[in-house]
Amino acid sequence: MASSPWGCVCGLLLLLLPLLGTGPALGRGFPRPLENSEIPMIPGAHPKGSVGSEPQAFDVFPENPRADSHRNSDVRHAPAEEMPEKPVASPLGPALYGPKAAQGAQRERLPVTDDLQMAQGPSSHGWTGPLDSQELLQQEAVAPHPVGHPHLTFIPTTPRRQLRVATVPPSLQHEGQEGQWPPRDEGLKAKTKSRVPPTSPSDHQGPPHTLVSHSGTVKRPVLEGQGGFEEHLQEAAQGPHFTQQDPAAPDVGSVPPVEVVYSQEPGAQPDLALARSLPPAEELPVETPKRAGAEVSWEVSSPGPPPKQADLPDAKDSPGPQPTDPPASEAPDRPSKPERAAMNGADPISPQRVRGAVEAPGTPKSLIPGPSDPGPAVNRTESPMGALQPDEAEEWPGRPQSHPPAPPVQAPSTSRRGLIRVTTQRALGQPPPPEPTASSMASAPASSPPANATAPPLRWGPLRRVLSFSWELHVYGVGVLFLLPALLALAALAAAPAGPRLALVAAVLVLVASALRSAYMLTDPYGSQARLGVRGGLVLYNLPFPLLLTALAALTLLGLGAGLPPPLQNPLLLGAVALVHGVGLLATDLLSTWSVLNLLTQGLSCAWGAAVALGTLCLCRRRLLDGPRGWDASPGPRLLAVAGALGLLASGLQLAAALWLYPGPGRVGRFSWAWWGVHFWLRLLELTWALALALAAVAAARPRPPTEHACWAKLMRLACPAPSGKSEVPERPNNCYAGPSNVGAGSLDISKSLIRNPAESGQLATPSSGAWGSAASLGRGPQGGPGLSRNGVGPAPSLSELDLRPPSPINLSRSIDAALFREHLVRDSVFQRCGLRGLASPPPGGALRPRRGSHPKAELDDAGSSLLRGRCRSLSDVRVRGPVPQHVVEAPDGAAAAASGSSLDSFSRGSLKISWNPWRHGLSSVDSLPLDELPSTVQLLPAPTPAPDSTAARQGDGQGEVQPRGKPGESRSASSDTIEL
C-alpha cells in the first residue's frame, strides 16, 4: 500500500523536532540553541483503543521515519504540504502543533516520575530562570535510572509558546518494548533526575510519545517525599494571557495535561514525584481532524461529555456539564476557568491555591473527595514517600497577579527564581483548613488582632528577650536599692530608741515596706517566675503601699500636727485607719476572685493615699508661709513636702498598675510598653518615697542639733527666698537672746538678760580713781551716814565730765535711774509717772516729766524738803557757778511745816533739765557749748546772808540740821537746770 499523507506529515514533523528546541535543554531548565536540540524517541507496541480508531504510533528514528505508516491507513491525515513547517515565533518559547494522540492507549495509569521543567525562550527565563553552577554539576552527576526506554510526552501550551516535558519510563519487565538506546539518548538519560518504583507490564500500555496541544491552566497532583503521606501539589499558574488561541489552531480545546515542576537545590536530594494517574482514553475524547481550507486544525474537546461520545464510562461521574473554552476573540478578555478532570475514577480535585496565582472565583477549595462522592478509586497509585518540608513561596517582579500579593517571605538562598512550590498535607478523612481568600487577605491589616493577643506573656524568658538587659537591670537594681531605706530606718531605730513614738513607728513601717518590696523584686518580680503563686505575689506587691502611706501620716502628725484640729491629732485614730486600710487590701487579694472588687479596693486605697499626701502638702505650705523657717521642727516641713509630693504621684501610678495586676478571669497578663512604663516609674517613685520617709524618721528621732550650719543656711535662703513683707529675723530687743526653748515673741522676759548693778555697798569716787569713774559710783553715799565729815569728801567732776557710758549691753533707762536718782528725787524712775518718795498721796500732776526747758513754776510740796538730805553725795558735789534761783531760795507757804529745816528743801523738781545728747554739736568740752545748752548749776547750800525774818527763822531751823554736815563755806550743788548725759 502506498504511503499515506499522514505518514509524510509525521516524518516531516519528526524532522522538525530538533529545530524546535526539544533536545536535552528541555530537561535542564535553561534555554539552549535550537539548532543543537534533538530528542530521540523509541517506538512501542500499542493496543487498540475503544473509540474506533487505532492509536497513533510514531517511529521517530531517523533511519526509518515512516516504517509503520501502514498501520494508520484507516485514519484520516492532512497532506504534508498543508502542515506548518515551523511554528510562529514567540518570545516565550517555541510551540509544537500536531495531531492528538489516541486515547485508548492511556486507559491504564502510568506513574510519571520526572519533574516538569518548562523550556525557556531565548528572551525570557519564565518560571524557573537559569541554573546555578552548583545545580548544574549536581544534575550532571545524577545517574539515570536503569529502567526501560523513556517515554516523552510533549505538551505544548499554545499561549505561552512553551514545551513541557514529562518523562515516563516503563518498568523493567516491559516485554512489548524492544530496541536499544541510541547514542544520543545517553545525554538525555544523564539529565533525567527521576526515579520510579517498578511497575507491572499492565501498568504501561500507552504510546511511547504523545503530542498534545492544549491551552489554559496546567496542573498536576504529585506525590513527593521519602516515607510520609503528604501530597504536594505543584502548579504552574497561567495568567489571563495564557488562554489565547494560536492562530494556527483556533479551535483547539482545553485539555488538562499532567505536569511536574521540579527544582533541584544544591546539597539536597532531588524531589521524587509520582503522578497519581494519567486519564484514560475514555476521559479525553478526541475529535477527528477537520479540513478547513488549506489548513489542518486539531480540535480537542473539553472534559465534558461530547455529543459523539456520550457513552463514556466517566461521563456520568462528572457533577455537571463542564464548560468549554471561550472562542479566540473572547479568550484574552477574561481569565480561563480551571478545568476539573476525573482522574482514576475519583472525584475531581481542584488545583491548590498559590499565592499570587490567577484563579477564577467559584473554584472549589476541597482537595479531598467527600464521603458521598460516587467515583471509584481502583487504580489509585500512591507511593509511600515521606513529605518534604514546605518551602516558602518567592515573589518576583513580573509575576501576574489578580489580587494584592501576600507579604514577602524569605525563600531558601539556593532556590530558583520564579519557582513556586506548594505543599499541602493530606490527612485521610479530614478536610484541610480553608485557605484565605483574596478579600480576607486584603482586609487583614485592617482587622489585625490586638497587641495583647500576640504580645509575649509576662514571663521571664519573653520579657528578657523583649527588654534585653533593661529587664534584669530593673529587677535586680530595684531589689538592691530598696535595701537602702531599710538600712536608714534601722539606723534611726538604733540611734534613738527613746525618741518620739511616732518617729519610731514611721521608721518601723519604712523598714518593713522596703524589705517586702526588695524580697518581691528578687524572688518573683511581677510573677514572671511563678515562685510565689498568684495570691502570694499580690500580697507582696500591694502591701508596701499602705505601709509607706501610714509612715507619711505619722510623720505629718508629729511635725505638723499643731495645724490640725484637735480630734485629728490623736495617734490612735491614725492607727485604726491604717489597720483598716492594710487588712482590707490583704482580704481582697487573698479571698476575692472577682477582679472588679479588687479594682474597687485598689481605687479606695489610692484615694486615701492621695488625700493624705494632699493634706501633708497643705500643712507644709501653711507652716512655711506663717511660721519661722528654721530647722527647729522635726521633721522639717520641707522634707515632709517632698515626701507628700512623691506619695501623691505614687498613688496615681499604683491605681494605673492595678489595671494590669487584675487582667480578669481566664486572661493572661501580656507585655506592652504601657505596662513597662507604668511599672518602671512606679518602682522609682516608691524607692524615692521610701528614702524621703526614712530621712524624715531619722531627723525626727535623732537628738536636736545645736545650731544650723552657716553654709547650709545660705543655701536654703537662696533656694527658698523669704516672701515680700516678711522679715527673716523677728524684731526683738538688742539685749534679748532667745534660748533653745523657742518661746514666742510676746512672752519674752528680758529680766533675765539684764545686767544688774552691784549692790549699794559701792565706795564713793575718790580722786585716786580718776575723774572718769564708773556710773555705778553715782548715788552711793558713804556708809558712815550723816556723821561723815566734809574732809572725807573729795572734789568730784561735774555731770558733764562724768563717764556715763555703761558697758554694753545695758538697759539705759535703769542705768540712769540707778546712777542719778536712786532714793534721791523720784520714787522709781525718771521715765515713768511716779510721785516723790515719802508722799502718802502724791498729787495727780506731781510726777516728774523729762521735758527740756520746763519753766520752774511748780511749788515745792511738804515732802520735797525731805528728799534732799545729807545722803545725796553725788549732787552735793556739784559746784556753784551762779546765783541760786529765786524759786529755789524762797520756799512757798504751806511747805515750811513739812520741811526738814535744810536748805535743800527749796529744791524744785521742775527745774531739772535733761539733755540726752550733750555732744551732738561735735564740741570737745562743756565750755564751748552754746549758752542755751550750758548746764546751769545751783547752789544747794548757799552762804548765810541777811534775809527777812520769816526767811531767816525758817532758814535757822533748817540750818540746825544741816550745819553739822559741813562747813558753811562749802558750796554744794543741789541740782542743775540741765543734766547732760
UniProtKB/Swiss-Prot annotation:
Residues 297-302 are annotated as: O-glycosylated at one site. Residues 65-85, 331-340 have a biased composition (Basic and acidic residues). Residues 1-27 form the signal peptide. It is a multi-pass membrane protein. InterPro entries: PRRT3 (IPR043242). The modification Phosphoserine is found at residues 777, 789, 798, 808, 815, 854, 874, 902-903, 911. The modification Omega-N-methylarginine is found at residue 780. Residues 411-427, 972-981 have a biased composition (Polar residues). This is Proline-rich transmembrane protein 3. It comes from Homo sapiens.
